Amino acid sequence: MLIPRKVKHRKQHHPRQRGIASGGTTVNFGDYGIQALEHAYVTNRQIESARIAINRHIKRGGKVWINIFPDRPLTKKPAETRMGSGKGSPEWWVANVKPGRVLFELSYPNEGVARAALTRAIHKLPIKARIITREEQF
């Protein structure tokens, strides 16, 4: 699982999800990529699940890059707890994804297999996304 080693503050505010991604919108390392088309919080478990789906499909022939990192804690209060008494404890870590952001990159010699692997990964993510190549822009 992807989690930060050390953070300055254990709990954070939740910002509104607005705007489009200003950086990380092109494929830099691989040949193909998954690009987000909407706002979302992607959890560390969803990132790991998508990575496993890609690796199982391509087996040993290619290389995968993960371009997002879950650096924001989301908190939750325990079940059957009365209101008040402060903010809940951190439950999971999420990455704040904006439209246009490239989430995963893949380098693989066969385009058909690469697209099939990335399609499987998209099904594991909670957002609408598309597959792009190195030449495409947002």
UniProtKB/Swiss-Prot annotation:
Record InterPro entries: Ribosomal_uL16, Ribosomal_uL16_bact-type, Ribosomal_uL16_CS, Ribosomal_uL16_dom, Ribosomal_uL16_sf
UniProt entry tagged with the keyword Metal-binding: no
UniProt cross-references to Gene3D superfamilies, sorted A to Z: Ribosomal protein L10e/L16
Biological processes, Gene Ontology terms: translation
Keywords in alphabetical order: Ribonucleoprotein, Ribosomal protein, RNA-binding, rRNA-binding, tRNA-binding
PROSITE patterns: RIBOSOMAL_L16_1 (PS00586), RIBOSOMAL_L16_2 (PS00701)
UniProt entry tagged with the keyword Ribonucleoprotein: yes
Basic residues bias (residue ranges): 1-17
Region listing for Disordered, in residue ranges: 1-22
Cellular component GO terms, alphabetical: cytosolic large ribosomal subunit
GO terms of molecular function: rRNA binding; structural constituent of ribosome; tRNA binding
Record note on quaternary structure: Part of the 50S ribosomal subunit.
Family: Belongs to the universal ribosomal protein uL16 family.
Xref: PANTHER family: 50S/60S RIBOSOMAL PROTEIN L16, LARGE RIBOSOMAL SUBUNIT PROTEIN UL16M
Function: Binds 23S rRNA and is also seen to make contacts with the A and possibly P site tRNAs.
Name of this chain's protein: Large ribosomal subunit protein uL16
Name of the gene this protein is made from: rplP
